[in-house]
Amino acid sequence: AAPERRVVLAALGPKMLALSAAHADGALPYNVTPEHTARARGIVGPGKAIYVEQKICLTEDAAVAREVAAKQLAMYLVLPNYRNCWLRLGFTEEDLSGQGSDRFLDAMVAWGSEATIRARLQAHFDAGADHVAIQPFDPAGGTSPDWNALAVFAPGD
């Protein structure tokens, strides 16, 4: 038998989330917080899948983590769909100005100890996510994924 295949919509706002509930197998929100995941679950309902993405940076140095976060989020800060989503989540224009406030950067990129990052991933599951995809940023600022973080959070076999 053929494997089950699901088609989900990339969805941030309430209209796209409702569309994903009505016409797809679920939603894939990107650049979101666990609070957004809870809102998304409320809109798409219990019978649809929610696959979220969470950026991570395995470092306990706040300055390093925020520098990496600011670099990685810069291209999204100018896009209206993401800005509107973040404003709906309670961020302010001030939070989204420049490279983003510490509050914004900390909300978008989980950083800290392994336990701290695992708690953020769990917060998405607790909020209704079916799957959480991690995007591990290199604390050294490299363009490749942080292979150490992958070994910790997605060890495979």
Residue ranges of model-derived segments:
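Active-site-adjacent structural elements that line small-molecule/cofactor binding pockets in enzymes
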Residues: 1-157
